Regions:
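Extreme N-terminal "head/tail" segments of very large remodeling/mechanoenzyme assemblies
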Residues: 1-183
Length: 187
């Protein structure tokens, strides 16, 4: 029997699950493929305003929360400045402009049909087993509403290569992508 305050086991003996990487493709201001490696001992996300800190956290929230319950850019939301949503992240919206008719509209990095991928890779500390959470989102060039966003979510018991996902999803044909994910045991 253990004394009060004494642990029954050390944390080194427990197989914990820790976030090890966040990968985004065409998410917010991150155009193309970007990966953030997370140190299992801890990672500090810091930087100037507009450097992408909230953008990375919001990518994680997109995978971890039900779509109807995601609140983006909570730091700005406290100041009533929250103007981010799933479509604005997919489009890479930044600022606004006035169009030829005098209407204010968003400025976007990606106006065309676009695919966005978010991957959170988790790793067990002792066994080194991996789990990948995936979110794949795509919209047509004329889409501006949340209801227009097509979504595919997957949980895989192995790391999944985002470049391979994109290759399977060329021409916005979802069938080869779904076949690829089904072929991965446990996805």
């Amino acid at each position: 029997m253990s004394k009060q305050g004494e642990l029954l086991f050390s944390y080194d003996e427990v197989d914990q699950v820790k976030l090890s990487k966040v990968t985004v493709y065409n998410w917010g201001s991150f155009n193309g493929l970007h990966t953030l490696n997370i140190d299992p001992e801890g990672t500090l996300i810091t930087g100037e305003n507009g450097s992408g800190k909230s953008t990375i956290i919001d990518a994680l929230m997109t995978l971890l929360r039900p779509a109807s319950r995601v609140s983006y850019n909570l730091a700005a939301a406290q100041e009533k400045k929250n103007d981010r949503n799933l479509v604005s992240y997919i489009r890479g919206s930044f600022g606004s402009m006035v169009d030829d008719e005098g209407n204010q509209t968003s400025r976007n990095l990606r106006e065309q049909a676009v695919v966005t991928v978010i991957k959170a890779l988790y790793e067990y500390t002792a066994s080194k087993q991996q789990v990948a959470l995936l979110g794949i989102f795509y919209i047509n060039s004329d889409s501006t509403a949340y209801s227009d966003v097509k979504k595919i979510y997957s949980v895989c018991p192995v790391d999944v290569d985002v470049k391979e996902l994109l290759f399977r999803f060329k021409n916005f044909d979802v069938r080869p992508l779904k076949e690829y994910l089904k072929a991965i045991e446990g996805c």
